[in-house]
Amino acid sequence: MSNITIYHNPACGTSRNTLEMIRNSGTEPTIIHYLETPPTRDELVKLIADMGISVRALLRKNVEPYEELGLAEDKFTDDRLIDFMLQHPILINRPIVVTPLGTRLCRPSEVVLEILPDAQKGAFSKEDGEKVVDEAGKRLK
């Protein structure tokens, strides 16, 4: 079993790039398709705490439930926002990666490089062609 977990949405380019950077470090992570298998309340609360971000910082804004539920308004408690994320997992921003070195919301995808225990094994370019890692496994920016 891997010591790296990614909360992944295969329809998201950032999530796909993050997954491939994990694989480029020589590790096959545990992949949780969070839209199909959302975290429990306790898991979500722990992820947020471990990332050191606010509940609202994990909330996706460019999806239908955000508008429909009026989540732009600052009237909801953190507990209520978590309820909405559990009811509508599409509201959870992604990808979230958990490693022995930390937990991060990997936006942009290069954030994952900060918490991977093993170095990149070679060059890596994002799906759009942007070069992120050189042939020696070193981050370019």
From Swiss-Prot:
The active site is at C12 (nucleophile). InterPro entries: Arsenate_reductase, Arsenate_reductase-like, Thioredoxin-like_sf. One of its GO terms (molecular function) is arsenate reductase (glutaredoxin) activity. It is an enzyme of class 1 (oxidoreductase). Pfam families: ArsC (PF03960). The record marks H8, R60, R94, R107 as: Important for activity. It catalyses: [glutaredoxin]-dithiol + arsenate + glutathione + H(+) = glutathionyl-S-S-[glutaredoxin] + arsenite + H2O. GO terms for biological process: DNA damage response; response to arsenic-containing substance. Its EC number is 1.20.4.1. Keywords: Arsenical resistance, Oxidoreductase. Induction: Induced by sodium arsenite. The keyword Phosphoprotein does not apply. Belongs to the ArsC family. Involved in resistance to arsenate. Catalyzes the reduction of arsenate [As(V)] to arsenite [As(III)]. PANTHER family: ARSENATE REDUCTASE, ARSENATE REDUCTASE-RELATED. This is Arsenate reductase. It comes from Escherichia coli (strain K12).
